[in-house]
Structures are given as C-alpha cells and as structure tokens.
Amino acid sequence: MEFKEDQLVKWLKLTKVPKLGPSKILKLFNLESDIERIFSLSDEQLLQTRLFNEQMILDFSQLKRASDDNFIRAIKECKENNIQVLTILSDAYPSYLKNIPYPPLTLFLKGNLELLYKNKVAVVGSRNADENAKNWTYNLSKKLVENNLVIVSGGAVGIDYAAHRGALDAKGNTICVLGSGFFRMFPEKHIELFKEIERQGLLISEHLPNFPGSTIALVQRNRITSGISNGLVMVASGEKGGAMIQTKMAFEQRIPIFYPKEELNLQPNEGVIQIKKDWAGIEIESVEDIIKKLIIRPEIRTES
C-alpha cells in the first residue's frame, strides 16, 4: 500500500497516537484498509475495533484536529532532499523487518534502497575502543564487503566509524542507521562520512528530518541495525553501554552473534566475555566463520 501526500500526513498523525503500536496499526488496517476510512470512524466504531481505549480515542481526536502544517512541511522537505519514505504497509518494506519486536512504522531513507535486499552484517562496538580494535574492525569490514556483504553500523565514533570506513575504502556498500533526522545528524565531525555513505550506501532513520535525536532514539535504532542484518559482530565493549544493548537486541531477534578471539585482546573486552558466557556467541578467526553461520533470508537477493 502506497500513500499520496495527503494520506501520508494522516498516516504520520496516526502513528503518533500513544499506545497504538505496530501490532495494533497492522490489525487496524486489516479491519479498515483505507486511511481515509480510519480517520472517519466514530468514537464508537473505534472502540468496536478493540484496538483503542477511551484515552487513545481522545488522543487520536486531538491529533486529527491539530494542524497538518508540520507534517506537510516535513513531506515537502523529504521530496526536496531526495529522502524516500517507506511505511510498514508499503510493498517495498522488507518483510523480515516486520517480524522484529516493535518494527519501525515509517522509514526515511537516503541512498540505495536496493541494499535493504542484500545480505548484511552489523558491526558494532564501543566508542572508546582501542586502536587495535578499530584496526581489526576496519580490516574485517573490508573483507566482508569483498565477499558481497553490506556493512551495517550506527555512524558513531570508534568501532562504528571503523566499520563504515573499511567498507567504503574497499569500494563496498554500507548502511548507517541514525538516531536522529537527516537534518540533525551527529556527531558533526562525521558529516562528510554520512555524505559518503549516502553516495555509496544507505542512510536510514525512523524520524522526521528535523528530529534532533535523543538517548531513547539512539537505543531504539539498535533494533533496526540488527533487524535488517543477517548477523552481528560485536567487536569490543564494556559490560554496559550501547553496544551491549545492541547485542542483546540481536540475541532477542535470534540472529547469530559473532565476536573476535579473546587472544586478540581487543579492548574493552568485558562485553565479549559476557557474550561468550551468556549469549551463545560464535568466536571467529576469519570471515569464512561468519559467512557459514549467517541467516540467509528467502527474499534476500544473492549475487548471480
């Protein structure tokens, strides 16, 4: 299902209703397949769907009455800046992403959408990783793209940067999942990196272009990073932090989790020890160790 611009405004409003998450919205569209029809339902009809309670109906009513201006402006900005909008109802939305816990309802994308259908490996780790860990990550990413795999990471300093840089320098493809909108990307010193990824890969956000980012958004984007990937490599991390939250999400999504040999002593390594002990991680010595354990999804297009 594809939306016209006025329908997309309604969709964006609908997704802002508190407690009306992906599962309920998908059920709602199974009952009422037209966004215009949903917006015309009476309070009683909304209650009869058993997807809304009285407070949600009040919230929805307020959103319907609210000005459309911010959403209209955001959609215009997307068109003017080559930002593509993909909803969970779109035929182009990857089916495997729908199956993760709490899938993103709307994706904003810049770059090569075809990479959504390629085999991908998420490479993550600490912002404070040592030089050995960053060098190992860089070389791993180069080897992975040489084997027709796409590198997925989050654009942060440390391991993320090394992962993207290795893929780009090897003339491969990489995807960056952002925790902000496209007009507010950070860290600022990576703006040129983000531009390069747009040209040679794909930028993904679930937020309107002017969203400034937040701690919660950075955590939430992790489910997309692992959700679009066939496996995840956790290079170096302490016991806590974003990389460990990301790895836990990958574990819950049941994708393979890989880690470097402990003997390499890539720092910090407390997280690697925990993965080995608690999360059935797979120790790797070579790229081949990753490739043979990846989950290959049916809709992923393989190289001929």
Predicted regions mapped to residue ranges:
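Short, positively charged patches
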Residues: 1-135, 142
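Glycine-biased, small-residue-rich flexible motifs in mid-sequence functional cores and linkers
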Residues: 2-5, 88-304
